[in-house]
Amino acid sequence: MQYAKPVTLNVEECDRLSFLPYLFGNDFLYAEAYVYALAQKMMPEYQGGFWHFIRLPDGGGYMMPDGDRFHLVNGENWFDRTVSADAAGIILTSLVINRQLWLYHDSGDVGLTQLYRMRDAQLWRHIEFHPECNAIYAALD
């Protein structure tokens, strides 16, 4: 199978305020902070900074740290590799979406469960054709 960088849309400055509520629903403040916390935990050289918001053509999206490549370590599954900023953003956002999906499923919040289930499926469809899909799969395994 050949991989090509899937089409994505960088969210413009004028749309940044509406992107996170679109992506995470009314849980957006917590979910955004959780992405930053995971970056701090999983990327040893991460010192904070600007994040790009990426919208997928078929819906959903992800957050991506500004930079070229990041060393990412997931102590829960022994993942320890350097990946592109794009792959790092996908990994971190996917982890947050998945954890929030199960949190709201277990608490009985049908609306947020459905939103996170949809966002999870949209991001996985994007990952399937990403040039770094094998690294992303390994990080999320």
Curated annotation (Swiss-Prot):
<dbReference type="Pfam" id="PF03230">
    <property type="entry name" value="Antirestrict"/>
</dbReference>
<keyword id="KW-0614">Plasmid</keyword>
<protein>
    <recommendedName>
        <fullName>Putative antirestriction protein YubI</fullName>
    </recommendedName>
</protein>
<dbReference type="InterPro" id="IPR042297">
    <property type="entry name" value="Antirestriction_sf"/>
</dbReference>
<dbReference type="InterPro" id="IPR004914">
    <property type="entry name" value="Antirestrict"/>
</dbReference>
<comment type="similarity">
    <text>Belongs to the antirestriction protein family.</text>
</comment>
